[in-house]
Amino acid sequence: MAYWLMKSEPDVFGIDHLAAMPDGTDHWDGIRNYQVRNMIRDRMQPGDQALFYHSNTKPPGIAGLMEIVSEPYIDHTAFDPEAKYYDPKSDPDKPRWYMVDVRYTRHFDRYIPLDELKQRPELAEMKLVQKGNRLSIMPVTEDEWQAILAMEKEGA
């Protein structure tokens, strides 16, 4: 099992949206970065756990947990001219983009803002808090995962 942090804008698709989906499950589409695509396609597996991170909001931070519940598969939204994430260069015979299905696990007892994550020495090496790392999905080590779960309980 691997751990991930997956970013989404809460006004577009936040943890509340995922929780409200049938069975709390939806596809995580719209990835249009090759490095992130490779992580999805080559490394994500059912059973992996993910932190749901709210980005482009004030303050950005971790809102809760979800689980990867499918094998990676072709992101069909790339082929649909009416879709938000349409990619006119994408070809169904040679697909570029992949996605996975995710299932809501739970909201955190308290929201953990990015500024608080940055203050923790045990998270100093976490990709999220390093300058210049703006990827929408990134791996999380087991130690980082456990530290964040412990932070959730502080002051809750």
Region locations from a protein language model:
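Aromatic- and Lys/Arg-enriched surface recognition patch
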Residues: G64-L135
